[in-house]
Curated annotation (Swiss-Prot):
HAMAP family: Ribosomal_uS5_B. With S4 and S12 plays an important role in translational accuracy. Located at the back of the 30S subunit body where it stabilizes the conformation of the head with respect to the body. Transmembrane segments: none annotated. The lineage of its organism: Bacteria, Pseudomonadati, Bacteroidota, Cytophagia, Cytophagales. One of its GO terms (biological process) is translation. It comes from the Bacteria. This is Small ribosomal subunit protein uS5. Keywords: Ribonucleoprotein, Ribosomal protein, RNA-binding, rRNA-binding.
Length: 172
């Protein structure tokens, strides 16, 4: 795998919007029966290329969401967004989930499933085509989408690494 340039961001510096992706009721089987609690998956972002995801678990839904938001604020990354879309195609993988993301022409919109849509909207990506394969579990899909976004490379960084002009990066 090539070197991944991930720029982490401090949550206190920016204003973030939260998207609750999924809330699950989970059970722990004990001697007296089942003990129920909740887990929540949340995606946060500023709409300008910063996105993060988090998982929270608690006995109450609101507490689980709060914990997930706090966790998401600790996992913020910066994604290269060019004219509201991605710089290039990429495949993201996590566990059994595979995600294929592709840049789209202006006006296309976000063509993606529910869990992926939350990630793209939080990151401020307005035009993208995405397909999820394998696992449809929201947790795996969110992590695979974040993996694909982490692997994205900005065109100016590619040009700098190759030692060529920006026009050569796109036109060969």
């Amino acid at each position: 795998m090539s070197q991944v340039n991930v720029k982490t961001v401090k949550a206190s510096e920016i204003e973030l919007k939260e998207h609750v992706v999924a809330i699950n009721r989970v059970a722990k089987v004990v001697k007296g029966g089942r003990r129920f609690s909740f887990s929540a998956i949340v995606v946060v972002g500023d709409g300008h290329g910063v996105v993060g995801h988090g998982l929270g678990k608690a006995n109450e839904v609101t507490d689980a969401i709060t914990k997930a938001i706090d966790d998401a604020k600790k996992n913020l990354i910066k994604v290269p967004v060019i004219n509201g879309t991605l710089p290039h195609e990429m495949i993201g993988k996590y566990s059994g989930g595979f995600v294929f993301v592709k840049p789209a022409a202006p006006g296309t919109g976000v063509i993606a499933g529910g869990a992926m849509r939350a990630v793209f909207e939080s990151a401020g990506i307005k035009d993208v085509l995405a397909k999820s394969k394998g696992s449809s579990n929201p947790h795996n899909v969110v992590k695979a989408t974040i993996d694909a976004l982490v692997k994205m490379r900005a065109p100016h960084k590619v040009a700098m690494q190759r030692g060529v002009a920006m026009s050569k990066v796109f036109n060969g």
